[in-house]
Design a protein with these regions (language model features):
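Short, low-order "capping/linker" segments at domain edges
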Residues: 49-67, 93
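Generic non-transmembrane alpha-helical segments
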Residues: 24, 28-36, 59-67, 85, ...
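Zn-dependent metallopeptidase/amidohydrolase metal-coordination segment
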Residues: 70-137
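Short, contiguous acidic/charged loop-to-helix segments that flank catalytic cores in large enzymes
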Residues: 15, 46-51, 114
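Conserved short beta-strand edge segments in small beta-sheet-based binding/regulatory domains
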Residues: 35-43
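Midchain, well-structured core segments that form catalytic/ion-binding scaffolds
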Residues: 1-27, 45
């Protein structure tokens, strides 16, 4: 929130489900704000989503579960990833937020990011097998 030319300005960034679109959301916001405010400079990007039952997603999650012995299921997240820059891609990899880290270890994607060696080697195995399986799929 900031002031511009004597007016309060608020920027907004929101994520919305695949069952709607940016124009519909903008119309609903305009209808809700009434008088004394306006919605301007609306930009929108189509939500990025790939169904969990596609062969590629199944190959990735099946590989993860077979290697780890887990029973994980695919999930979506609200933030954007590098995957949205490709027509048919997802971010994929193990996420172990519950593991103890070395004293110097930082959080995932943060300064001094750390993970136990056995989990890094397990991740390499998952990636190799998943890539070999993905190579067999006719996209």
């Amino acid at each position: 929130i900031f002031m511009r030319e004597g007016r309060i300005v608020q920027t907004m960034d929101s994520r919305y489900p695949t069952c709607t679109d940016g124009d519909t959301i903008a119309k609903q916001i305009r209808a809700a704000i009434g008088t004394g405010a306006e919605l301007t400079d609306v930009g929108s990007a189509k939500p990025f989503y790939i169904e969990a039952d596609t062969p590629a997603i199944k190959a990735c999650i099946d590989t993860y579960n077979e290697v780890t012995g887990d029973h994980a299921t695919p999930f979506t997240m609200g933030g954007g990833t590098y995957a949205r820059h490709f027509p048919y891609a997802v971010s994929f990899g193990p996420e172990h937020v519950d593991l103890p880290l070395p004293e110097f270890g930082g959080p995932m994607h943060g300064a001094n990011e750390a993970a136990p060696i056995d989990k890094l080697l397990e991740a390499v195995k998952i990636y190799i097998i998943a890539l070999l399986r993905l190579e067999e799929i006719d996209f």
